[in-house]
Regions:
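Solvent-exposed alpha-helices and their adjacent loops that cap or buttress functional pockets
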Residues: 1, 43-44, 89-93, 102-106, ...
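ATP-binding N-terminal substructure of ATP-dependent carboxylate-amine bond-forming enzymes
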Residues: 1-77
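Active-site "cap" helix and flanking loop/linker of ATP-utilizing ligase/carboxylase catalytic domains
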Residues: 51, 135-154, 169-217
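Glycine/small-residue-rich loop that forms an oxyanion/phosphate-binding "nest" at active or ligand-binding sites
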Residues: 62-83, 89, 122, 130
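Internal nucleotide-binding/catalytic subdomain
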Residues: 86-152, 159-161
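A short beta-strand motif that forms the metal-chelation/ATP-contact edge
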Residues: 98, 161-172
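Short beta->alpha transition motifs characteristic of CBS
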Residues: 112-117, 167-174
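Peripheral (often C-terminal) accessory segments that flank ATP-dependent C-N-forming ligase machineries
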Residues: 193-273
């Protein structure tokens, strides 16, 4: 069986994530530049089995022109059009992230629901019952089946009413940094497995909770100096400078949040010890 080649149009910040996972799987991947003309995308796609696109970066009319040339596109244009018809609501101070991947043979995987606040993400979202979590995830699975999704997406919904959709992210979920450090299988690997129609991986947490927080650089310092104190204080902290995140896995959520908040405050210069 020939090794497949995939074309990808996505945000710059996630291209390297997809490339790393493709390399691990031994899959060829061509990173197509954002803003390319329809003609150039068609030309670059000639040696690809299919292309994966972020629908937020290229118009549906352009995608249809590309598809008419014989290029296979994931997610399917029909799925993109179905999602585009959904009503969006204003963002809120607390939101839920529900992430799903689906293969052409309808195998589906979801991660635990993530709580999104202004500065911290928690997976799984605390203070929601198992019954509510199941209801939310089932509604997402049903939507993925209804639109015949191939690939993956993130639904960001109001934490007070999950029926209020706030945003849809295709290749760059808000919660993907959490899954990268704390899930058996991260989003980018799972997305590739989905579009390749490979069996999907385990999406469970490695620990009871994953907590990640946003980092802000101290205007009087740099992004390197804080490592000396923070890594010595807690060697379990994970840093991601590409996304400006700090993360932690564990079973004691209260202690984890204390550590994340301390890291945020020290990193930005709010505290000095």
């Amino acid at each position: 069986m020939a090794i497949p080649n995939i074309g990808l149009i996505a945000d710059e910040i996630v291209k390297n994530n997809f490339k790393q996972e493709a390399d691990k799987l031994g899959i060829g991947i061509k990173l197509l530049e954002n803003g390319l003309s329809t003609e150039k995308i068609i030309e670059l796609s000639k040696n690809c089995n299919f292309i994966c696109v972020d629908p937020n970066l290229i118009s549906i009319s352009s995608l249809k022109s590309i598809e008419r040339s014989g290029v296979i596109i994931y997610p399917p244009i029909s799925a993109i059009e179905s999602i585009a018809k959904l009503n969006l609501h204003p963002s809120n101070s607390e939101m839920f992230s529900i992430v799903v991947t689906r293969t052409p043979h309808a195998q589906i995987s979801t991660w635990p629901i993530t709580l999104i606040t202004e500065n911290i993400l928690i997976t799984p979202a605390p203070a929601i019952s198992d019954e509510q979590a199941i209801e939310i995830q089932l509604s997402t699975i049903n939507l993925a089946n209804e639109i015949q999704l191939i690939g993956g997406l993130e639904l960001v919904v109001d934490a007070g009413d999950f029926r209020k959709l706030i945003a849809v992210n295709w290749t760059n979920p808000i919660s993907s940094p959490s899954f990268a450090i704390g899930s058996v299988t991260g989003y980018f690997e799972q997305y590739l497995r989905a579009v390749l129609d490979l069996p999907l991986g385990n999406s469970k947490n490695l620990k009871s909770f994953i907590a990640t927080g946003n980092l802000s650089t101290d205007i009087n310092s740099d992004d390197y100096r804080p490592y000396l104190h923070l890594m010595a204080r807690n060697p379990n902290l994970k840093f991601d400078q590409l996304r400006k995140k700090v993360g932690l896995l564990g079973d004691d959520l209260e202690n984890m949040l204390t550590e994340i908040i301390h890291a945020q405050q020290y990193y930005c210069g709010e505290i000095d010890e």
